[in-house]
Amino acid sequence: MEGIEESFAPLSPKSPFARRNGRSLRIQRLVDCQHFHYSSVELGPVRVAIIAINADENATERIKMRVESESNSWLVERSREDWAVFDRQLHRCVFERRHSRLDELFPLIHLETAKFEEVLVKYTERLSELTGSIITCYPVLKFLEIDSRGGHFEPAEETSINVPAIAAAVVTKDFEPTESSQLRLRVGDIVSITEMSTASPSEQTFWKAKLTISNQKIVDPQNARLGFEIGYFPRDCVMLIDDKRLPNPLNNEQKASTRNARRYMTTMFRNRRREPIFGLELTDLYMRTGKKVPVIVEKCCASIEDQGIVTGIYRQCGIQSNIQRLRAKFDSGAEPDLHEFGQRDIYSVSSLLKQYFRQLPNPLFTYQAYPKLIEAFEKEDSLSEKVESLRFSLETMPEAHYRTAKFLMEHLTRLCKSKSLTDMTSKNLAIVWSPNLFRPPPTLNGADTHLLSGLNVHTAICDFFIENSESLFVNDIDEEQSKCTSVENSFTTISKSATMSDMRSESESKWPRFFRGKSVEGFWKFNRKQQTSTGELCGSPTSEVKWRSRSTRSHSTDAAFQSSRTDSFIQLMHTGMDQIREGMRIFRARARSMRPTSRPPPSPRTRRARFSNGSSNNVQKLNESDIQHEIPLATTEPSITPEPKNTVDPHQIMTRTISVNDSDDQSFEENGLREMRERKVMFKAATQEHVATFHERSSPVEEWSSDSRESLHLEMSRYDNVSPSGTITRNQREPITNLSPAAQMLFFESSRASHLFSA
């Protein structure tokens, strides 16, 4: 094995971090170009010069260059592919290509040797002018074999030492050994951990590691082990390195042909859980999402401009529970409805935005640009000269930081225009925002000497940025803009997005976004909406009847009918079985009660009448043939009466006499079924008027219903003047005494008469 090798074998009990969540911890090799940034570096001028391009014993082309730093020089050999990866890493983490003005090497790696050498000569000359303490990226420094103090280091993978390691770490605090078995550490050194021992909380924990990268000089060049010692040190002196490697485009092209669908789907489902955005570098978030301005910044600023013009915005704090709830939603990849949330607690939205910028590892105005900004601001120049120097310093920041700062400062400038309503001037906003946007770079000894002295300067420069945002942030380059670079007396187009969003595949987020889409409820509503629109456009008689029945419902009925079907089943899936049963029971009851065909329950009086009539079953029905037989006699021979002496004109006053024998009811109950007794209708003259009244019902629906025939179920509040067949309207009801005898009897059909007179 060579260097720090990977091993999946079970580790000793002294390595508690060997397994995480039941899965083996992958041991990273330092040669795999793990990506991390030093918290601070001490680099002077670094000179890089191309010596020659030669072929080695394997006929592989190697580019030899000389690196000079801290009055030392050494030779480094790299390939064309190494230079292309270095160029992309340099412009991903350190420089913007618009500021560095360096040619992109990846499209030029297939040039002839002489032409490519000329390109590299120009490249290294420009690179030597840009190097300095701004370079904190470990892969960039490793390419030049420079440590954090500007000295030369030889990676352990290129030496004869071979010690299995389980992790790599960077030293964050100096440590002086007190025993011979301990290591002497300095800030910026790299160690390869070989053993992670545990101890009680009251004791100090020591780890064992190999000093991989150090500023110590190798005394004996023949023995490379002298510069790489193994020993113990306190665990709080180092920080483990997470693997954030830049994907190699050459390897991606080779692997694209061999990738199958099963592996792609497995990777997709495995990576469905999104990483949080709080505490994530702006450049890393941009590489992941492709957005120059984070979504949380756009959403919060839009919500505050719409609903946050209130007193003390950004000064008053919101409710902590609401802030944590919003943060959890953004970290999970969701986008909460800030418009609805802002109506209740807009101060929580403003506090969330400040918390996001406060937790950035590298502040919005980066550590690298901090000295230049302070120096340009403190110069006693005119306003135009100060704006010009600050603009130049701002353009050196990474593009994600520059665009986000431009967006935020323009938002604060618009907010200052409503200072009469918010009581927040540019000075007040600067006092609130400056601690979240400006932080002095950390020092090697960990002493923040500029923290207190820089507070006033931070407030002043933030106030200046808010008042002059239109003049400072003007160099805005479009996403699709490209620029031409001269290469060997010709012009080649280099796309600006070649080092940014185009490096990631656009197809990686399509399928996961589909599976992480809206809920089943929303999908069901969308499908149902399409079916409804299709049914309305259809010209069939069935769809026409359905459309008419929907339009006859009132707005309140429609709203209640629709709300009964919007209960989400997904919410019930997270509860117990008892709650699911109760929810289904309530859901069915609500749906049943909201149906258009449902009728109100009958009154207690109607129920008692139905029960008494149905249980005794002793109602004698009127024979339709008898009614038809008696009525013609009354109409054709009105003078024939049982008492001819007292003849009275039948048109004067008419009554109905219905003879019902009480003894028949008792005999009917005793003997069971019996032939219905014939009911006679007679007309006689009388001095006293007897008027038969209708059987009134308490329910308006029951008033128009009958047991023998179904009627249309209509809203009685809208159709009071509609007379269904076999009924009369309320407004046209007249006493029976005003009708002729024939009209009186023809009005009541047999089934209708039996129902009315049986009550």
Swiss-Prot record:
- In which domain of life is the source organism classified? Eukaryota
Which residues does the annotation list for site: Arginine finger? R315
Keywords, A to Z, come to: GTPase activation, SH3 domain
UniProt cross-references to SUPFAM superfamilies, sorted A to Z: GTPase activation domain, GAP (SSF48350), SH3-domain (SSF50044)
Task: Write out the GO MF terms.
Answer: GTPase activator activity
Q: Which GO terms describe its biological process?
A: positive regulation of GTPase activity; signal transduction
What sequence ranges are listed for the domain Rho-GAP? Answer: 280-473
Which PROSITE patterns does the record associate with it? RHOGAP, SH3
- Which residue intervals are annotated with compositional bias (Polar residues) in the record? 612-622
* UniProt keyword Chloroplast, yes or no: no
> SMART domains of this UniProt entry?
RhoGAP, SH3
- Residues of the region (Disordered) are 591-624
Q: Cite the SH3 domain residue spans from the record.
A: 164-243
Tissue expression notes: Expressed in coelomocytes, excretory cells, uterine-seam cells and GLR cells.
State the coiled-coil residue ranges. Answer: none
InterPro entries recorded for this chain? PX-Rho_GAP, Rho_GTPase_activation_prot, RhoGAP_dom, SH3-like_dom_sf, SH3_domain
Taken from the record, one Pfam family name reads RhoGAP
Write out the function statement from the record: Functions as a GTPase-activating protein (GAP) for ced-10/rac-1 and CDC42.
List the protein's name: GTPase-activating protein rrc-1
This protein's species is: Caenorhabditis elegans
